[in-house]
């Protein structure tokens, strides 16, 4: 099963999109396999990060960044 992650859901700013030459946030849509997400979560758990996400994984990037900042990694 694949989940679509939208740049808007990842809190990527419009300034960043213009810097990297994107015309719209829809141009940065990506698909991530659920197995890859679970592998990433396992690695982050081993690093001591506490990452929560909703069923659509839409806020996973924000949670990862917040957890990493809290861990000073």
Curated annotation (Swiss-Prot):
Expression induction: Expressed in the early phase of the viral replicative cycle.
Swiss-Prot/TrEMBL keywords: Early protein
Pfam families: Orthopox_F14 (PF06076)
InterPro entries according to UniProt: Orthopox_F14 (IPR009280)
Superkingdom: Viruses
Family to which this protein belongs: Belongs to the orthopoxvirus OPG058 family.
Listed name of the protein: Protein OPG058
Naturally occurring in which organism (per UniProt): Monkeypox virus
Lineage: Viruses, Varidnaviria, Bamfordvirae, Nucleocytoviricota, Pokkesviricetes
Designated gene of the protein: OPG058
């Amino acid at each position: 099963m694949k989940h679509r992650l939208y740049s808007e859901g990842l809190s990527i700013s419009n300034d960043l999109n213009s810097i990297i030459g994107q015309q719209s946030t829809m141009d940065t849509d990506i698909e991530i396999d659920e197995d890859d997400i679970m592998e990433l979560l396992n690695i982050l758990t081993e690093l001591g990060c506490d990452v929560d996400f909703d069923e659509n994984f839409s806020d996973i990037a924000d949670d990862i960044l917040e957890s990493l900042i809290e861990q000073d990694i």
